From Swiss-Prot:
This is Cytidylate kinase. It catalyses: CMP + ATP = CDP + ADP; dCMP + ATP = dCDP + ADP. InterPro entries: Cytidylate_kin, Cytidylate_kinase_dom, P-loop_NTPase. It is found in: Cytoplasm. ATP binds at G12, P13, S14, G15, A16, G17, K18, G19, T20. It comes from Shewanella sp. (strain MR-4).
Amino acid sequence: MSERAPVVTIDGPSGAGKGTISQLLAKHLGWQLLDSGAIYRVLALAAIHHDVELENEESITLLAAHLDVKFLTGNEKDPVQVILEGEDVTTAIRTQECSNAASKVAAFPRVREALLRRQRAFRTAPGLIADGRDMGTVVFPTASAKLYLTASAEERAQRRYNQLQDKGFDVNIERLLAEIIERDDRDMNRPVAPLVPAEDALVIDTSDKGIDEVLELALNYINQKLSNTN
């Protein structure tokens, strides 16, 4: 790991556009990309595969410490290929069931601690875009630039609905909205590493903004912050 490699953190709730913007920023800057949410999704999927109870913090923590996961360069559709125990789970971790399970295991303090070092190891030259929920507050508190993307629950539910429909999943938008509201409450009120903007983060509401507009705002801010540190 290189402590001197610059880091840009992108935090925010599910469906706010973190993944899309993070991928575009990493491609534009030629930097590494950390999708921290994928790590928790992989852990949740591993727990499901091994019949580990999601409410059992001790068992989940043990699983996290020995998690056999690799992140490989993917394709245009899936820029990052996720391999769990030798199996490609890139699509499997994107189900709503896996998303809800990930939020549950992420609430355990010992699980978060077990995965902290693994996440920080992604910090390598020339730089890192870190996408998650506590990247700027806990994992990389001294990041070069911090962004927090948000959007209304209704807008995020619609985006998630469209995304899952495109992948061939049969989903109900009312149920999606209820699950998003429930997850927001769980993520924002957990005792360890709650979902909140870092004090020095630029907050961008993406509800009524297109991808290009958000990307331009993010790049302008990042370039400004990086120029101030050089």
